[in-house]
């Protein structure tokens, strides 16, 4: 899948295990991608556009994917955490009775741990107000994880992705 500093997901992608990496169009706006990645033998990932785009196709997304999900990894950004559109989407997920796991990305923007702590407390409080309970929250840096996977392995620990990976594998 494409990645970048601006939104790159304009469609829903169903990502699952397969021997090659072709993309197949399943229906309008939904694509299937297979990849020879071992952990995909045990789970499928549904990658969606950001919440501003999702709200416009809210009914289709919820009726096709959320009811079948074991849990939803909801990604928010550390620089604009838990926006109003994100809050509305989490409320919709809650209506289906699905477990929500929150991922706070871009934690590498903070110079002090106290700044990250403040954002995590805000996200926890906001999620609790919508869900009635505080979901698991994983602070990560996708940028550092990507650099770690592409030649700078010393950055892996700073990305904090390991805890999220363990959670997903255990789920």
What are these regions (language model features)?
Residues 56-80, 89-103:
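Inter-motif core of Ras-like GTPase G domains
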Residues 49, 53-56, 60, 77-84, ...:
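Alpha-helix capping and helix-loop boundary segments enriched in small/acidic/polar residues
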Residues 108-171:
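Canonical P-loop GTPase G-domain recognition
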Residues 8, 19-22, 50-52, 79-82, ...:
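Conserved nucleotide-binding/hydrolysis micro-motifs of P-loop NTPases
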């Amino acid at each position: 899948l494409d990645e970048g500093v601006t939104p790159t997901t304009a469609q829903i992608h169903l990502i699952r295990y397969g021997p090659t990496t072709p993309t197949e169009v399943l229906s309008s706006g939904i694509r299937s991608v297979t990849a020879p990645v071992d952990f995909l033998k045990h789970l499928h990932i549904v990658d969606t556009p950001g919440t501003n785009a999702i709200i416009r196709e809210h009914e289709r997304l919820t009726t096709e994917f959320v009811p079948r999900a074991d849990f939803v990894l909801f990604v928010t950004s550390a620089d604009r955490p838990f926006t109003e559109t994100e809050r509305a989407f989490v409320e919709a997920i809650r209506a289906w009775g699905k477990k929500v796991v929150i991922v706070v990305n871009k934690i590498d923007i903070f110079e002090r741990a106290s700044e990250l702590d403040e954002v995590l407390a805000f996200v926890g409080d906001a999620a609790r107000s919508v869900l009635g309970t505080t979901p698991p929250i994983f602070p990560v840096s996708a940028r550092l994880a990507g650099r770690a996977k592409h030649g700078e392995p010393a950055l892996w620990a700073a990305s904090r992705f390991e805890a999220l990976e363990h959670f997903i594998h255990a789920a």
